[in-house]
From Swiss-Prot:
It comes from the Archaea. InterPro entries: aa-tRNA-synt_IIb, aa-tRNA-synth_II, aa-tRNA-synth_II/BPL/LPL, Anticodon-bd, Anticodon-bd_dom_sf, Pro-tRNA-ligase_IIa, Pro-tRNA-ligase_IIa_arc-type, Pro-tRNA_ligase_II_C. GO terms for cellular component: aminoacyl-tRNA synthetase multienzyme complex; cytoplasm. This is Proline--tRNA ligase. Belongs to the class-II aminoacyl-tRNA synthetase family. ProS type 3 subfamily. Gene3D superfamilies: Anticodon-binding domain, Bira Bifunctional Protein, Domain 2, C-terminal domain of ProRS. CDD domains: ProRS_anticodon_zinc. It holds the Pfam family ProRS-C_1. One of its GO terms (biological process) is prolyl-tRNA aminoacylation. It is found in: Cytoplasm. Consists of three domains: the N-terminal catalytic domain, the anticodon-binding domain and the C-terminal extension. The lineage of its organism: Archaea, Thermoproteota, Thermoprotei, Thermofilales, Thermofilaceae.
Length: 482
């Protein structure tokens, strides 16, 4: 990996391409000496902070307040909801010792925080006046994953978790709709990542939930990646933690609850993978740590100062207009090296300024997404950049949507399902609804999973199950996943 640029094609070897981009674009360092724990470098963290900001803004617009709960959760909290503990206990990291002394009770590093939040909700919620309660935290969580991949599956990963409580189930279901809309506003509208929100089958729902609704996107290798989810918890946790309220008639009732988890890590992975190309990252301007880079070009010492003077004026003008701009005046690198480096890092707009640009009052503008150049007059530069801000995002959305739709196929027969999964497609098919059939499909296709139905799907007669031939009552999506 000593070469400057990416040495493989994304379409031919996505796994190696992804590894090279993470390393060569300066996103992560995997040399930290604990497996599954990743060092996040500045370029990556600036992208992640922007994504966090988008979600936090949407959450707070819809009435959520930020909180921060302790990292550790006592074991007795976990034990309160049987299905939840059975689902998560195999992955939990336990703190059992402090200094040389063994702790009297084990403390879990949070794998998720229902059992921390709802312990406190039993104190905070007493009356109908305390509802709805809508809180979120932006944190790392910890799970002992066996097979790790940076930003996709790790033992420590970044996310947001929102935990909401309501007086009625109808309000909780409305919250799930709101969660899905918040996901759409950020993941699709701001980041250009297409996805399907699917209602997971009963055997694949979140541990302790009545229903799970999850957003799946399709990666370049055809595997799907769950990037966000929202869960109808019903009253299970309310009963386990005795979260009750007095209603307006003086009757004590259990609250209805939801939880929502945008996977910041995985959304970032999808952003990198879906928009990137064989030159490296391709970033929308709204998340790019540097939105505009200026590269001076001169070959004679006598031209240096007038070229740099123009570059400095452009830098000040662009910064004044509100953009993150960097003048790359490093003398130890050639302009060509700088071009490759900033393309690798995904900077959306590059300005090239040489003697000709100084003399003609123009700038050569390079668009990272299309890899095209055009001449723009100095006087029109800011309006041109403002237009590019939208144009680049719309182009990324167009390409991503085109790819996403091309990877979904319909099948009605077993061999069609097998062939589609072999070729990296997501399959839409009639399904009998039986877990045994889903298990057989997964085993026979080396990992093809029933991902679920569309959100408003109604059961009915849909002919024969494409896999087993039994009467089909559902139309489901099937794919291999990470």
């Amino acid at each position: 990996m000593s070469e400057q640029g990416i040495t493989v094609s994304k379409s031919e070897d996505f796994s190696e391409w992804y590894s090279q981009v993470l390393s060569k674009a300066g996103l992560v360092d995997l040399r930290y000496n604990v497996q599954g724990f990743v060092v996040h470098k500045p370029w990556l963290m600036r992208i992640i902070k922007a994504i966090y900001r988008f979600f936090e803004e949407e959450l707070e617009k819809t009435g959520h307040e930020p909180v921060l709960f302790p990292l550790v959760i006592p074991e007795e909290n976990f034990e309160k909801e049987k299905e939840h503990v059975e689902g998560f206990k195999p992955e939990v990291f336990w703190v059992t010792q402090a200094g040389d002394e063994k702790l009297e009770r084990r403390l879990a590093l949070r794998p998720t925080s229902e059992t921390a939040f709802y312990y406190m909700y039993s104190y905070w919620i007493q009356s109908w006046r305390d509802l709805p309660l809508k809180l979120y935290q932006s944190v790392s969580v910890y799970r002992n994953e066996k097979n790790t991949r940076p930003l996709i599956r790790g033992r420590e990963f970044l996310w947001i978790e929102a935990h909401d409580a309501f007086a009625t189930h109808e309000e909780a279901l409305n919250q799930i709709r709101e969660d899905m809309e918040n996901s759409r506003k950020v993941i699709w509208e701001k980041l250009g990542i297409p996805f399907l929100f699917l209602r997971r089958p009963p055997w694949d729902k979140f541990s302790g939930a009545e229903d799970t609704y999850a957003a799946d996107t399709i990666m370049p290798d055809g595997r799907v990646l769950q990037i966000s989810s929202t869960h109808d918890l019903g009253q299970r946790f309310a009963k386990a933690f005795n979260v009750t309220f007095l209603d307006k008639d003086g009757k004590r009732k259990y609250v209805w609850q939801t939880c929502y988890g945008p996977g910041i890590w995985r959304i970032t992975a999808a952003l990198i993978a879906i928009h990137g190309d064989d030159k490296g990252l391709v970033l929308p301007m709204n998340v790019a740590p540097i939105q505009v880079v200026i590269v001076p070009i001169y070959y004679k010492e006598s031209d240096k100062e007038r070229v740099l003077e123009k570059c400095r004026k452009l830098e000040a003008m662009i910064r004044e207009a509100g953009y993150r701009v960097y003048l790359d005046a490093r003398e130890e690198y050639t302009p060509g090296w700088k071009f490759n480096d900033w393309e690798l890092k995904g900077v959306p707009v590059r300005l090239e300024v040489g003697v000709r640009e100084v003399e003609t009052g123009t700038v050569t503008v390079f668009r990272r997404d299309l890899r095209v150049k055009e001449k723009v007059a100095d006087s029109e530069l800011i309006s041109h950049i403002r237009k590019l801000e939208n144009d680049i995002l719309e182009e990324l959305k167009r390409r991503a949507k085109e790819f996403f739709e091309s990877r979904i196929v319909t099948a009605t027969r077993r061999e069609e399902v097998e062939e589609a999964l072999r070729s990296g497609k997501m399959v839409k098919m009639p399904f009998c609804g039986r877990e045994e059939c889903a298990d057989d499909l997964k085993e026979a296709t080396d990992g093809g999973k029933v991902r679920g139905t569309e959100i408003d799907f109604k059961e009915g007669d849909y002919g024969r199950c494409a896999w087993c031939g039994a009467p089909a009552r559902l139309i489901v999506y099937v794919a291999k996943s990470y």
